[in-house]
Amino acid sequence: MGRFIFVRFGLLVVFLSLSGTGADFDCPPDWSAYDQHCYKAFDEPKRSGDAEKFCTQQANGGHLVSIESVEEAEFVAQLISENIKTSADYVWIGLWNQRKAPYCVSKWTDGSSVIYKNVIERFIKNCFGLEKETNYRTWFNLSCGDDYPFVCKSPA
């Protein structure tokens, strides 16, 4: 009897510890969950604007991925490595340059603040992607008209 109570208590502790960690959110089929968001890497190359539009059509609140921490960056890099099979050198993310004289300000397409950066400081072009050569961990400034695979992110 004591062993049974101990096992039930242990299961209760595990259940309560998983509550709110992301283990209980519901992402669409073939999407991956991380920190209360759902992610999916798409292998079909698109221009940055077309990829953003596609992401908004895939899920409620969907956008090209915003990366807000080193942990999220690692998760996204792993997701890309496992799912993008094309030979493309870059993968689109949702960071873009908003040119408002006299400044150039970077913004995420989902409206979130840029609080984490891992970018090569070259702001000639308006869009950003993750570079394959850096294992998808460094952000590069790219021409928005180029076609690359991309990652979508939406609230869970």
Swiss-Prot record:
Keyword check for Glycoprotein: yes
SMART domains from the UniProt entry: CLECT
Keyword Disulfide bond: yes
Top-level lineage group: Eukaryota
Cell location: Secreted
InterPro entries the record matches: C-type_lectin-like (IPR001304), C-type_lectin-like/link_sf (IPR016186), C-type_lectin/snaclec_domain (IPR050111), C-type_lectin_CS (IPR018378), CTDL_fold (IPR016187)
Tissue expr: Expressed by the venom gland.
Location of the C-type lectin domain: 34-153
Pfam assignment, any one: Lectin_C
Principal location class: secreted
Glycosylation sites (chain numbering): 141
Molecular-function GO terms, alphabetical: toxin activity
Signal peptide range in chain numbering: 1-23
One GO cellular component term: extracellular region
S-S pairs: 27-38, 55-152, 127-144
Keyword set, alphabetical order: Disulfide bond, Glycoprotein, Hemostasis impairing toxin, Secreted, Signal, Toxin
Family: Belongs to the snaclec family.
Description of how the protein assembles with itself and partners: Heterodimer; disulfide-linked.
Miscellaneous comment in the UniProt entry for this protein: Shows greater sequence similarity to the alpha than beta subunits compared to other heterodimer snaclecs.
Function: Interferes with one step of hemostasis (modulation of platelet aggregation, or coagulation cascade, for example).
Name the record gives this protein: Snaclec A15
